[in-house]
Design a protein with these regions (language model features):
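Ligand-binding pockets and gating/stacking loops
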Residues: 1-183
C-alpha cells in the first residue's frame, strides 16, 4: 500500500495536475482567481489524475488582513466577512467543482464533503463576530452516492441546538465509510 501511494504521488499524471496553467482562463475564472477557487480546481485535477483522497483547506488570501481572525473563524465582523469575502469565494468555487466533476463523469464516484470542525455561536458577540460553538453546525455532502436535495436534521429557531434528528461526528464518519471506502478498505 505504501508503494502504491508513493507511485501515485510520483506519477507524471499527478505532477501534471499541479500545473494549473494548463487550464484555460475561462475555467480558472469560473473557479475564482482566489486561493480557495484555485485549490478546488487543483482538487479536480488531482481526482482526474487518480488521487483517492483530496483535502482542500481554505487558505487565507495575502491581502486579507481586515481582521485578526482568519477565514471562517469570524470572531469579529461576522456578517461583513461572510457576505463580502467568504461566501463569494465559496459561491464561485464549489458549484464549479461539482459541475466539472459531473461533466467529467467523476461526481458519482467522488464524495465532496464541505465542513468545518464546529459551528458558530447563534448570537453575535460584542465585536460583531461569532465564537466557537460545538452544539450545532452544518455539513454538506454531494456526489459519491449521496441523494441530493435533502436536508437531514434541523436546528432550533436560532441555530443554537439540534431540534430534529441530531447527528454526531461518528454518524458522518460512518456515512463516509459506507459511501466511499466500503468493507474492503476497513
Amino acid at each position: 500500500m505504501q508503494q502504491r501511494a508513493f507511485d501515485v504521488v510520483q506519477s507524471a499524471a499527478t505532477r501534471a495536475a499541479f500545473e494549473l496553467e494548463r487550464e484555460g482562463p475561462v475555467t480558472r475564472d469560473r473557479y475564482g482567481r482566489h486561493k480557495f477557487g484555485q485549490s478546488c480546481l487543483l482538487a479536480r485535477r488531482l481526482i482526474e489524475s487518480g488521487a483517492r483522497l483530496v483535502q482542500v483547506n481554505w487558505p487565507r488570501e495575502p491581502n486579507d488582513s481586515e481582521v485578526g481572525n482568519p477565514l471562517w473563524d469570524t470572531h469579529q465582523k461576522n456578517a461583513e466577512r461572510v457576505r463580502d469575502v467568504l461566501c463569494p469565494q465559496l459561491d464561485s468555487a464549489l458549484p464549479t467543482l461539482l459541475e466539472d466533476l459531473a461533466e467529467r463523469g467523476l461526481l458519482a464516484e467522488t464524495l465532496v464533503v464541505v465542513m468545518g470542525e464546529f459551528g458558530r455561536t447563534p448570537r453575535h458577540n460584542a465585536s460583531g463576530g461569532r465564537d466557537h460553538w460545538g452544539h450545532c453546525f452544518s455539513v454538506a455532502l454531494a456526489g459519491g452516492g449521496v441523494r441530493g436535495g435533502q436536508v437531514i436534521g434541523a436546528s432550533d429557531r436560532i441555530g443554537g441546538y439540534t431540534a430534529d434528528r441530531p447527528l454526531r461526528p461518528q454518524d458522518l464518519a460512518a456515512t463516509i465509510f459506507h459511501l466511499q471506502i466500503g468493507r474492503a478498505h476497513v
